[in-house]
């Protein structure tokens, strides 16, 4: 066998052994981190910042839409399509101006 096959086989066996070892470990033995400050029946305990205990009268971040109507947000409807008549008229005006420029430099 070539060295590459031996190396690949060794890596496969080592990976398998590592997976078996990790899966056999008991992961639930560790200490569970809780949130004691979020329990509703406990009184507020902020001695340094008593204002943190009282609910604020004004929201921390007031609502903003994110963009104004003039900038046409993604959720707004797209602009109305240009009619064929307007496209033809605009092309004729452009062609006439271009031809006038070419004829009279």
Swiss-Prot record:
This protein's UniProt keywords:
Disulfide bond, Hormone, Secreted, Signal
Q: What is the reported tissue distribution?
A: Expressed in seeds and rosettes.
BP GO annotations = calcium-mediated signaling; cell-cell signaling; regulation of growth
Q: In which broad location class does this protein mainly occur, judging by the first location in its UniProt entry? A: secreted
Q: Where in the cell is it found?
A: Secreted
Record keyword 4Fe-4S present: no
- Source superkingdom: Eukaryota
> Signal sequence: where?
1-30
List the GO cellular component terms: apoplast
Q: Which InterPro entries match?
A: RALF
**Keyword Secreted tagged:** yes
Q: Name one GO molecular function term.
A: hormone activity
Membrane-spanning parts = none
Cystine links in this protein are 44-53, 67-73
Family membership: Belongs to the plant rapid alkalinization factor (RALF) family.
Q: Provide the function of this protein.
A: Cell signaling peptide that may regulate plant stress, growth, and development. Mediates a rapid alkalinization of extracellular space by mediating a transient increase in the cytoplasmic Ca(2+) concentration leading to a calcium-dependent signaling events through a cell surface receptor and a concomitant activation of some intracellular mitogen-activated protein kinases.
Database matches in PANTHER family: PROTEIN RALF-LIKE 15-RELATED, PROTEIN RALF-LIKE 16-RELATED
This chain belongs to the protein called Protein RALF-like 21
Q: Which organism is it from?
A: Arabidopsis thaliana
Q: What is the lineage of its organism?
A: Eukaryota, Viridiplantae, Streptophyta, Embryophyta, Tracheophyta
